Amino acid sequence: HMLQLLALVAMEPPARLDPAAVRDEKVKVLRSLRPITARDVESHSVRGQYGAGAIAGQPVPAYLDELGRASDTETFVALKAHVDNWRWKGVPFYLRTGKRLPERLSEIIVQFRSVPHSMFGDAAMKPNKLIISLQPDENIGLQLMAKLPGL
């Protein structure tokens, strides 16, 4: 699912709007993914299992307690991926998924590079972002660099 979304965001426009052409462009992206070597695993990924906690004030058990046996299966994974092609060279893609997170959310955030200088003096400006929300509400939003009114 996450790789499908990454491929859709990173693919080139297909020559035709038919399933085969879209699939071919997505495959090009997936083939361009930089492999994560054993040496890079620690610096490019995080994995874990949820522990005991509470949901809506009710206690919930840890993953291993629910399972009733030892397991190395992840319930959370985050990784930094790179698409090694001319368009995405040097641009990291961050993918995160997990069970029992604080909110059920699926979104794609494209964070644009910061401008090299600010026309508003030394004010720290947040980067522009394109936010594509898939779950729980479908939405497309744009957060733009802006300053508070006044000098």
Where are these regions (language model features)?
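Secretory/organelle targeting and membrane-embedding segments
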Residues: 1-151
